[in-house]
UniProtKB/Swiss-Prot annotation:
Cofactor field: heme b
Chain residues that bind heme b b566: H97, H196
Subunit organization: The cytochrome bc1 complex contains 11 subunits: 3 respiratory subunits (MT-CYB, CYC1 and UQCRFS1), 2 core proteins (UQCRC1 and UQCRC2) and 6 low-molecular weight proteins (UQCRH/QCR6, UQCRB/QCR7, UQCRQ/QCR8, UQCR10/QCR9, UQCR11/QCR10 and a cleavage product of UQCRFS1). This cytochrome bc1 complex then forms a dimer.
Pfam families: Cytochrom_B_C, Cytochrome_B
Keywords: Electron transport, Heme, Iron, Membrane, Metal-binding, Mitochondrion, Mitochondrion inner membrane, Respiratory chain, Transmembrane, Transmembrane helix, Transport, Ubiquinone
Organism, as annotated: Phyllotis xanthopygus
Cofactor stoichiometry and binding remark: Binds 2 heme b groups non-covalently.
Main subcellular location: mitochondrion
Descriptive protein name: Cytochrome b
Amino acid sequence: MTIMRKNHPLLKLVNDSFIDLPTPSNISSWWNFGSLLGVCLVMQILTGLFLAMHYTSDTATAFSSVTHICRDVNYGWLIRYLHANGASMFFICMFIHVGRGIYYGSYMLSETWNIGIILLLTTMATAFVGYVLPWGQMSFWGATVITNLLSAIPYIGTTLVEWIWGGFSVDKATLTRFFAFHFILPFIITALVLVHLLFLHETGSNNPSGLNSNSDKIPFHPYYTIKDLLGVLLLLMVLMILVLFFPDVLGDPDNYTPANPLNTPAHIKPEWYFLFAYAILRSIPNKLGGVMALILSILILALFPLINSSKQHGLVYRPITQFIYWIFIANLLILTWVGGQPVEYPFTMIGQVASIMYFSIIIIFMPIASMIENDILKLHY
């Protein structure tokens, strides 16, 4: 008798993607974050759906509706904090996923990598419009400041900003459309995830050694389903500790004050996961230059497959580039910290140095290190 999962048109897709998928036998726990991102996405869509049942996207009632969710809806506080802190877990997993891709040379699977960059940008857009919805002070001013950056585009900038706002300031029309965007974008992300997986399964997964693993593959189930399940349990444990004990630790106190266009907060800053890009944005004194640097800080990831000149796949056997990689990670953490500090000396100076380092490491230092390591290889072999 033939096995149904191998022949049924729908089950065959699931089988080839999650059950009988040939997987390298040596992939480490750094490969767990793809499945964790999937779990985060499903959780965000479900909690978001339940929040949307009670939320009203009107400037007069948005803040009150969020208060109503937390106070009057059964377990509304839990759903709200799961959604807010789930976004943080989503970005932690995504940053680790990208970091692993850089470390192990996964960017050489260029189609998968490029779809991943589009996914990152789409997720950032979703998180940004979502942060505006509670209509607190930081929601309102964050929306005003970030959308205003588009006015730096020559000729069409001002018109574009007013078109996005739906008026001459961030108001009712802006909130309504941001809610619409926030609802639709996760489904676009889901579609992109399927494309991401489609391209990944065309080539097969990379592995820590960077060598071809076609001669040594094992089925995804049960080996990696069990391994991923452990990762999911650890993720949920960290998330529940955050939600139940420190629900507001990653948020901004200003967002508990209703939006007031007449009163500007002392320090306008986005959520923590955007701080590195925000630090790069404000380290450049020119508005258009800052916006370009902000966009390039993400799009520069697309250069990795192009500027890679190493004879080896990944950084496992490349000590010089490894050292530079960890400096890059430390530099990112410094940018994240600086992004949350006020715009004054010494933070502005630290931000400018860290921003220059961010781009220099990728464009200059890593390729030079690759060339040196290639020369060392020539000497030995």
